[in-house]
């Protein structure tokens, strides 16, 4: 017998939960469109190589990967940024830069399901391609602040920020190849500090200022102050390192000016392999997972064979944001009128339908009654379901050109002209 449960790690949503998801999406869309971002829609199914080219074959264990009927190895997308880069390379390179893109869509990861972690979930995000200015990083962070302020979560979240470019510069100076770099960053992302230190011990034999600095970042990055980090970076005589810390300091100052709570964690890295500069995550103090994240990725377009195109972006987890809203006790039940139109006999159905259409055109949620039971039993049924008004149509109403309105909240009934119907429905309940 077929199971009625959704697949493990996937969820069904109905009514209020669906409304919350759409509400989050709508607020996100309005926020980013006002900032000049244009929507992109890409397929859920992509060539597996699109993700493995930068992320490596080990991604296979955390993805839905399969062969299609043409024996092509394809995957359900685990994120959307690579798809946006593919779209850019395929058809958007001629657009003026910077190019501002946003997306909303479902993604799939074969993770072990747990609180806040799903195998199917929704992401909404932005990508800004074609600018290496720190102003681009500030723009997307400001946009993130705008969105969470719009949905009344700004004062309940905090940003964790760093600049992964600091690690990249040090690793490059130490001549670590890309595979070693990504492995070290993966270990740091997973909190496996001792394993990372072991690799560094094997590869760095001297006791240079660079070695001291990287060990300080790994073991003491969270508590390391930017001013202290700047002094230590200057000792390495790597000017690029100083520049990256200065960029991070500017971002922190901008976030402070926006009154957005944040911490600078110089040991913080993110798991995605393509980040090259400032990175960030949004956390809520009472949740064990982040609800959004992003950063700069200046080399990803080149990885896919394009010209160097600096880029920065972020993605929010829609279900995680919904969880944060629910956990905070924010209610979404609408106080808008909910109307049922009752035709007392079949001869007045055309007139009842015209009333239904008129009310829907005016923006009211309106249904045509299809319960063929006495009116005396309809009233309590609709009241129990949360309806606010019954519009009753019979031969008497047709003849008089009026309608009978039953207010289920105030338990009152009046007769009114059709042209006054919307005013009667929207009158406040005292």
Swiss-Prot record:
Stored CDD domains: HisRS-like_core
Subcellular location: Cytoplasm
The keyword Cell cycle is annotated on this UniProt entry: no
GO biological process: histidyl-tRNA aminoacylation; L-histidine biosynthetic process
Keywords per UniProt: Aminoacyl-tRNA synthetase, ATP-binding, Cytoplasm, Ligase, Nucleotide-binding, Protein biosynthesis
The organism's place on the tree of life at top rank: Archaea
EC number: 6.1.1.21
Molecular function per GO: ATP binding; histidine-tRNA ligase activity
GO terms under cellular component: cytoplasm
Gene3D superfamilies for the chain: Anticodon-binding domain, Bira Bifunctional Protein, Domain 2
Catalytic activity as recorded in UniProt: tRNA(His) + L-histidine + ATP = L-histidyl-tRNA(His) + AMP + diphosphate + H(+)
One Pfam family from the record: tRNA-synt_His
Principal subcellular localization: cytoplasm
InterPro entries hit by this protein: aa-tRNA-synth_II, aa-tRNA-synth_II/BPL/LPL, Anticodon-bd, Anticodon-bd_dom_sf, His-tRNA-ligase, HisRS-like_core, HisRS/HisZ, HisZ
Residue ranges crossing the lipid bilayer per the database entry: none
UniProt record similarity statement: Belongs to the class-II aminoacyl-tRNA synthetase family.
Protein name: Histidine--tRNA ligase
Lineage: Archaea, Thermoproteota, Thermoprotei, Sulfolobales, Sulfolobaceae
Gene this chain is encoded by: hisS
């Amino acid at each position: 017998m077929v199971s009625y449960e959704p697949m493990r790690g996937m969820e069904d949503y109905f009514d209020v939960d669906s409304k919350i998801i759409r509400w989050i999406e709508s607020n996100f869309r309005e926020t980013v469109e006002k900032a000049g971002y244009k929507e992109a829609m890409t397929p859920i199914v992509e060539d597996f190589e699109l993700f493995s080219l930068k992320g490596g074959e080990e991604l296979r264990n955390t993805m839905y990967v399969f062969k299609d009927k043409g024996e092509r190895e394809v995957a359900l997308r685990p994120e959307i940024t690579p798809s946006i880069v593919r779209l850019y390379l395929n058809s958007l390179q001629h657009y003026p830069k910077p190019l501002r893109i946003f997306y909303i869509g479902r993604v799939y990861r074969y993770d072990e399901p747990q609180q806040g972690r799903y195998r199917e979930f929704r992401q909404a995000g932005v990508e800004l391609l074609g600018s290496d200015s720190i102003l681009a990083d500030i723009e997307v962070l400001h946009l993130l602040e705008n969105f969470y302020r719009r949905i009344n979560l700004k004062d309940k979240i905090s940003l964790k920020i760093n600049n992964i470019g600091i690690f990249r510069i040090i690793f490059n100076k130490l001549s670590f190849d890309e595979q070693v770099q990504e492995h070290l960053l993966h270990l740091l992302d997973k909190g496996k500090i001792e394993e990372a230190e072991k690799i560094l011990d094997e590869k760095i034999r001297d006791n240079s200022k660079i070695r001291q600095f990287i060990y300080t970042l790994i073991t003491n990055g969270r508590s390391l102050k930017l001013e202290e980090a700047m002094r230590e970076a200057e000792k390495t005589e790597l000017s690029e390192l100083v520049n990256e810390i200065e960029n991070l300091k500017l971002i922190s100052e901008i976030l402070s000016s926006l009154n957005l709570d944040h911490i600078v964690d110089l040991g913080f890295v993110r798991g995605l392999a393509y980040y090259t500069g400032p990175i960030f995550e949004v956390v809520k103090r009472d949740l064990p997972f982040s609800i959004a994240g992003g950063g700069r990725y200046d080399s990803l377009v080149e990885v896919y064979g394009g010209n160097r195109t600096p880029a920065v972006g972020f993605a929010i987890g829609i279900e995680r944001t919904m969880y944060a809203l629910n956990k905070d006790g924010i209610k979404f039940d609408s106080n808008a009128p909910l109307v049922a139109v009752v035709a007392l006999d079949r001869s007045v159905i055309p007139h009842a339908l015209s009333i239904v259409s008129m009310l829907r055109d005016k923006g009211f949620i309106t249904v045509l009654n299809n319960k063929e039971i006495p009116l005396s039993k309809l009233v309590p049924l609709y009241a129990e379901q949360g309806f606010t008004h019954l519009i009753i149509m019979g031969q008497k109403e047709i003849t008089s050109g009026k309608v009978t309105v039953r207010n289920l909240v105030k338990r009152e009934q009046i007769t009114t002209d059709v042209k006054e119907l919307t005013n009667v429905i929207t009158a406040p309940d005292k």
